[in-house]
Amino acid sequence: MAETYSTLAALFTDIADAIREKTGATATIVADDFPDVIRNVLQVKTYLTFSSPSSFTLKVNDTTKHWDGILEYSTDTSTWSTWDGTTTLSSATSRSDNVLYLRGTGNTVITGNGNKDSYKWVLTGSNITCIGNIENLLDYATVESGNHPTMADYCYYYMFYGCTGLTQAPALPATTLTTYCYSNMFYGCTALTHAPALPATTLATSCYQNMFRGCTSLTQAPALPATTLAPGCYT
């Protein structure tokens, strides 16, 4: 049954909480700003946003590029630089937060089939949210056009393994999955409090294997709408 509200204030408070949960923001939303805030939330973002109240860094565990196209990073969404995977990226201050933005072009895989967690990404910091559509790392122009980029096997394999400072996961909107694509993706993310929605209806071998293993702060599992399963998909 849909929730009812006794006052408009209660309704707007709930809407504000939902917006903050979606965007990762913490500031109070005043009534006059509601229309613009909602419009901004509804706009398609063509990048992935990492955000924290404190400074943080991001690197590839073995300082090697494993994506098969281009990844770019920015701290202001205006100036973008190519990331070759060999350097450590640092956040920059934006208002009350520290932020780092990433987007990709022509990628079908981000981490790939390494030796377990050898190709993982390492986030060093605390209270880090990852906001936006993960597919922006594959090809942001495809996402902007309303489509899903092609995803290869082992696409996000072990990507955030052991990232204990990650508190919010990105959206995972793909509806057709590939072998081991999300396997071990959030393994050991002990600060993760909510699992992202998993809308996929076409599964693949071991696609979700150990995806949330060791996520000790999760209290509720996501809905699993697929009606036809694949070998090891939920192991």
Which residue ranges define each predicted feature?
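Surface-exposed receptor/substrate recognition regions of extracellular proteins
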Residues: 1-49
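Exposed beta-strand and adjacent loop surfaces of beta-rich binding modules
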Residues: 16, 66-70
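Extracellular ectodomain segments of secreted/surface proteins
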Residues: 42-66, 136-140
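Structural signature of tandem-repeat unit edges
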Residues: 48-51, 84-92, 102, 110-112, ...
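Noncatalytic modules at the cell exterior or secretory-pathway interfaces
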Residues: 56-58, 91-108
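Conserved Ser/Thr-centered positions that define the repeating blades of beta-propeller domains
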Residues: 70-76
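Surface-exposed loop/edge segments in extracytoplasmic proteins
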Residues: 76-85
